[in-house]
């Protein structure tokens, strides 16, 4: 079998969802049924394979994306399939966090994966982080299948969950399984492709399951959903469509072919159900992974930039192409040091070879290559297109970098990282901890690009910035556990931003004469607001040599640096454009540095007069509460400047959706616990930046002046 043909039996998938929807439990069952694990780990016992960090086992949540490889031989009683030789599929799985503070782990995993299992809580349905993960998958056009989990739980409602997928995710769910029973009577599923019931044994940890005829009380419903299934899927294949409208019977293989085609193209999303904790539905989920999610061969050619020509090119995902890969994660392993996870897009990679990091123009030697199973590892000598492996000892490579062969150098599309929304001041408990803190943060930031740390040049105070309170709490924990560094931690602070609301043109001259060589630079810059999310843009419209082109990078550099300290309260300035339209220079006294200084002073003057405003992060908050506490909870959200968007009943509880400034949400978990006697719960995700009220802006400016 050729290497490229083997690729058709590889699946690179992620498992993602809202916290507590059952992602890690589902993954643990997959590892058990595929023979990777000989016992089933449980989140509540702290014995899971995929959650291997101490903080993960202590808290019962997934923090880092753990990678593992398993193999699956599909069990099939379909005559067309059974006559063929059984084929083993290689499945590379990345289990991602569901907590909003670790969204970056989800994003960078999706960037290198070909497909995703979206796990939904059968009781809660589509939750806020489910939406966030879904939008990230949309961004990278990752094909998905859905698994409605926890069908054994009180309040589980498969059909409500499917409707929520339509309403909240804007997707087209394709139901390919129906639950048999509900809550404590749930015992299996109806397979709408085979038109058979599948029932799991309560013994052998669900390893055995049998096919039965469809229960008589479900015939009408099954026929209805089967009709909907066929009407949807035949649209993707003209030949099969013609057979269908001619009333010819469609084979299972035909139906699967159509589902696969539609799922990979994103026309619809197959929906399955089960209970991972009760060991029901996982084997059929694995079958769906190999049937309906793409192999590397199904992925379109990758886009890249040729280093020599700087032109955009495409490269086939093939073993026959030159080697290229993207580094999507770096971790520090206590036994082997730095581990760099890569997804190989083309060609082959052998240990002992030399490659080039084209992002940084640095050569790297591949001394050791590992297949990872959570924190266990297996040495390998060669990896090929489609593989996800870990490399040890890379000196220059960090997350988002491209590595490729020396003979054909390209740069792949980078991974985008979210900006921090919260910060903490940290200081060493003892002078001896000062250097250790810096060293620890350098290593942690290399692993996690959403972690940023800075040192105030005036106070020498160190500030760490991240995606939420839990994110920074975990960082402090890891500094203590892994690096033996004790730190005093300040109260959390919001990472505000600044922007402008109107255009303003500045004509600024920087002139300095101190005997000897002087400094001279004149710049004329238009500062204008941009739409939300546009960031910073610089454009030069200099013509006729008013400013020599070698000095223009100095203007851009000056603006890039100064925009990080805005004029309102010292926060980064975003969503504006600076257009250099004129200027002048001196033959002797002008320099790149002089134009850098001129640009910085022009920024201070121009932004001050362009209607500067302070922006704060707004969070989308979902609160689930028993009816009797609704009044107090809504009153509290209103007192936090919250805007209630909707309220919807769910059994004897209510779901409140609101937008609330992050600065008003610190310590909310304690307040909510007190208001509801511990019975309500909440989750929140970052939504957008919004102008803060005048009173809050004045408070922040007053703090800044102290």
Curated annotation (Swiss-Prot):
Residues 8-297 form the tr-type G domain. The gene is fusA. It is found in: Cytoplasm. GO terms for molecular function: GTP binding; GTPase activity; translation elongation factor activity. HAMAP family: EF_G_EF_2_B (MF_00054_B). Belongs to the TRAFAC class translation factor GTPase superfamily. Classic translation factor GTPase family. EF-G/EF-2 subfamily. GO terms for cellular component: cytoplasm. Pfam families: EF-G_D2, EFG_C, EFG_III, EFG_IV, GTP_EFTU. The keyword Nucleotide-binding applies. GTP binds at residues 17-24, 95-99, 149-152. One of its GO terms (biological process) is ribosome disassembly. Keywords: Cytoplasm, Elongation factor, GTP-binding, Nucleotide-binding, Protein biosynthesis. The keyword Nucleotidyltransferase does not apply. This is Elongation factor G. PROSITE patterns: G_TR_1, G_TR_2. Catalyzes the GTP-dependent ribosomal translocation step during translation elongation. During this step, the ribosome changes from the pre-translocational (PRE) to the post-translocational (POST) state as the newly formed A-site-bound peptidyl-tRNA and P-site-bound deacylated tRNA move to the P and E sites, respectively. Catalyzes the coordinated movement of the two tRNA molecules, the mRNA and conformational changes in the ribosome. It comes from the Bacteria. NCBIfam families: EF-G, PRK12740.1-5, small_GTP. Gene3D superfamilies: 3.30.230.10, 3.30.70.240, Elongation Factor G (Translational Gtpase), domain 3, P-loop containing nucleotide triphosphate hydrolases, Translation factors.
């Amino acid at each position: 079998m050729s290497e490229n043909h083997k690729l058709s039996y590889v699946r690179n998938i992620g498992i993602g969802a809202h916290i507590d929807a059952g992602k890690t439990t589902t993954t643990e069952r997959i590892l058990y049924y595929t023979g990777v694990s000989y016992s089933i780990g449980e989140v509540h016992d702290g014995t899971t394979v995929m959650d291997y960090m101490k903080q993960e086992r202590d808290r019962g949540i997934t923090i880092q994306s753990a990678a593992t490889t398993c193999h699956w031989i599909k069990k099939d009683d379909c005559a067309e399939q059974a006559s063929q030789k059984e084929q083993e599929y290689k499945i590379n799985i990345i289990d991602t966090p569901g907590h909003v503070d670790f969204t970056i782990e989800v994003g960078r995993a999706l960037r290198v994966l070909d497909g995703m299992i979206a796990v939904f809580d059968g009781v809660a349905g589509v939750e806020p982080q489910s939406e966030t993960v879904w939008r990230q998958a949309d961004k990278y056009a990752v094909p998905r299948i859905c698994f409605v989990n926890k069908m054994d739980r009180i309040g589980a409602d498969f059909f409500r969950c499917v409707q929520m997928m339509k309403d909240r995710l804007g997707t087209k769910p394709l139901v390919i399984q129906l639950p048999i029973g509900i809550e404590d009577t749930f015992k299996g599923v109806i397979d709408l492709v085979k038109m058979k019931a599948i029932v799991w044994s309560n013994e052998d940890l669900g390893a055995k399951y049998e096919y039965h005829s469809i229960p008589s009380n479900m015939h009408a419903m099954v026929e209805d959903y089967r009709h909907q299934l066929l009407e949807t899927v035949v649209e993707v294949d003209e030949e099969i469509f013609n057979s269908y409208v001619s009333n010819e019977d469609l084979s299972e293989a035909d139906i699967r072919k159509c589902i696969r085609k539609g799922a990979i193209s994103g026309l619809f999303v197959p929906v399955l159900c089960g209970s991972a904790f009760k060991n029901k539905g996982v084997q059929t989920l694995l079958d769906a992974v190999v049937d309906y999610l793409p192999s590397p061969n199904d992925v379109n050619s990758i886009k890249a930039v040729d280093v020599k020509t700087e032109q955009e090119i495409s490269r086939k995902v093939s073993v026959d192409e030159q080697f290229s890969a993207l580094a999507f994660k770096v971790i520090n392993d206590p036994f082997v040091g730095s581990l760099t996870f890569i997804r190989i897009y083309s060609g082959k990679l052998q240990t002992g070879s030399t490659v080039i990091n084209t992002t940084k123009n640095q050569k790297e030697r591949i001394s050791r290559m590992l297949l990872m199973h959570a924190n266990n590892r297996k040495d390998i000598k060669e990896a090929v297109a489609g593989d996800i492996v870990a490399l040890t000892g890379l000196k220059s490579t960090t997350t988002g970098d491209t590595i490729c062969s020396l003979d054909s150098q390209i740069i792949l599309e980078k991974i985008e990282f979210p900006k921090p929304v919260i910060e903490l001041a940290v200081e060493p408990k003892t002078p001896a901890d000062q250097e250790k803190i810096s060293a620890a943060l350098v290593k942690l930031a290399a692993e996690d690009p959403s972690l940023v740390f800075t040192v105030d040049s005036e106070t020498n105070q160190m500030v760490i910035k991240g995606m939420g309170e839990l994110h920074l709490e975990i960082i402090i924990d890891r500094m203590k556990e892994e690096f033996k560094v004790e730190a005093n931690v300040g109260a959390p602070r919001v990472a505000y931003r600044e922007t402008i609301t109107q255009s303003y043109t500045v004509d600024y001259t920087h002139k300095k004469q101190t005997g000897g060589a002087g400094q001279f630079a004149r710049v004329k810059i238009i500062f204008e607001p941009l739409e939300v999310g546009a960031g910073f843009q610089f454009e030069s419209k200099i013509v006729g040599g008013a400013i020599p082109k070698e000095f223009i990078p100095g203007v851009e550099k000056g603006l890039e640096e100064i925009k990080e300290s805005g004029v309102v309260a010292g926060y980064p300035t975003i969503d504006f454009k600076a257009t250099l339209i004129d200027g002048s220079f001196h033959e002797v006294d002008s320099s790149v540095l002089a134009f850098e200084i001129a640009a910085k002073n022009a920024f201070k003057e121009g932004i001050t007069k362009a209607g500067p405003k302070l922006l704060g992060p707004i969070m989308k908050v979902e609160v689930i509460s028993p009816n009797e506490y609704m009044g107090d909870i809504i009153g509290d959200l209103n007192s936090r400047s919250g805007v209630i968007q909707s309220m919807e009943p769910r059994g004897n509880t209510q779901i409140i959706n609101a937008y609330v400034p992050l600065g008003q949400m610190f310590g909310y978990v304690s307040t909510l616990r007190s208001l509801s006697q511990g019975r309500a719960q909440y989750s929140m995700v970052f939504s957008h930046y919004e102008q803060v009220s005048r009173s809050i802006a004045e408070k922040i400016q007053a703090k800044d002046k102290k």
